[in-house]
Amino acid sequence: VLSDQGALFEPCSTQDIACLSRATQQFLEKACRGVPEYDIRPIDPLIISSLDVAAYDDIGLIFHFKNLNITGLKNQKISDFRMDTTRKSVLLKTQADLNVVADVVIELSKQSKSFAGVMNIQASIIGGAKYSYDLQDDSKGVKHFEVGQETISCESIGEPAVNLNPELADALLKDPDTTHYRKDYEAHRVSIRQRSLCKIVELCYVDVVHNIRAVAKILPSTAFFTDVN
């Protein structure tokens, strides 16, 4: 599939966001499950084995996630794309509706208490990546993009919807320490949820940029853009 450039990408002007969105969607549909022989990682579903998030230090709230299963990245849409051909830098932002399911241990470190269960998060996000690039000739004189180190950003659109399995929700509801902290938690709930979600998203977008880097090694620069040389 990847040897057929026309099937993988539609070359676009760097100014044509509609074309870039179509081309990105085409690539994601082809490669979202990963292509190991080209070092393209699966991103939908994207699996993260474990992640610890210090969610709110004031009450010692820590989320210990395991077996995170993230879906929705294959349907991400470009919301912003800026390419500076003089400085050879790219700003890419995409919007996606994500669904996250994970085993979780919710720790209240100040009380030495933990509660285990399953968490489901649903949210709309904007993930961003800034990276440098260069154009390099391969052994046959064909130009390829070489993608530099990325800086990842994340924005949660509104408040993420969070659901816990009934046993975990019931345990948190009845525990005296969680009852004591509930008012403080509720006052900061939106920012806690957004910050925790973005820690997950940032790991996801490392793989998204990795795949951009990987496919740039396979295809010539002309497979991506009509106005970069």
UniProtKB/Swiss-Prot annotation:
* GO CC terms of this entry: extracellular region
The positions making up the signal sequence are: 1-3
The record's keywords, sorted A to Z, are: Secreted, Signal
Q: Does the keyword Signal apply?
A: yes
InterPro entries xref list: Haemolymph_juvenile_hormone-bd, To_sf
SMART domains in UniProt: JHBP
Chief location category: secreted
List where in the cell it is found.
Answer: Secreted
- What is the recorded function of this protein according to its Swiss-Prot or TrEMBL entry? Prevents juvenile hormone from being hydrolyzed by general esterases by combining with it specifically.
Can you say what this protein is called? Answer: Juvenile hormone-binding protein
Instruction: Give the source species.
Output: Manduca sexta (Tobacco hawkmoth)
Identify the coding gene: JHBP
